[in-house]
Amino acid sequence: MTIEDCIKKLIKIDSLQIATVDKNGSPQIRVISARIFNNTTMYFLTAKGKSFVKEMENNRNIAIIGFDEKENDMIRITGIVEKVSQEEQLKWRNKIYETYPYLENVYPNETKNINVIYKIENYNMEYFTLSTHPITRQYFAIGNTKIKFKGFKIGNECISCGTCKTVCPQNVITEGTPFVIQQEHCLHCGNCFDNCPVNAIKEF
């Protein structure tokens, strides 16, 4: 998969889920359908009075996820959300309304002035699929950001006993000194971490 492939898939998926954090530190999640992409930047629409807006203004860290049920593909975005500048609000609102005509029934006539547009252009994107064996996982950095890898790594304390390889459900640990986890196929289950007799495996 490429970045472009992931964007196309996110466009094709009917609705995405977006996660925020409220003022009490509790996670909140919502479905968003009214969104468009301009290259790799995603623009989405909501209404000014919603708690969703307050949450994004208080904590701009968000996560977005899309799941393709037919292909068992998941794409996750994590990054910093930004409110579109006042000069650009009308432009992107009109583009979203053109893409999603049903919005005219939700916000008819002048009531659409309550809308506000946000965007996310600097983010990490993770592609994960269960359709391959072993599973496939890819990371991308979009805009002004760096890839934040997750998972497990085998350190130099490894004694090459082979325990990790034996307990890996995807069989993606390669023999060596030290043994090596194939990161693009790692399930992140932690079974190797739990079973290493010398604690040579670290989470990052």
What residue ranges belong to the model's regions?
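Helix-adjacent hinge/juxtasegments
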Residues: 63-88
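Extended, small-residue-rich solenoid/repeat segments and analogous flexible loops
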Residues: 145-160
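Charged, gly/pro-rich active-site loop segments
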Residues: 80-148
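Iron-sulfur cluster-binding cysteine motifs and their immediate structural context
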Residues: 163-180, 191-204
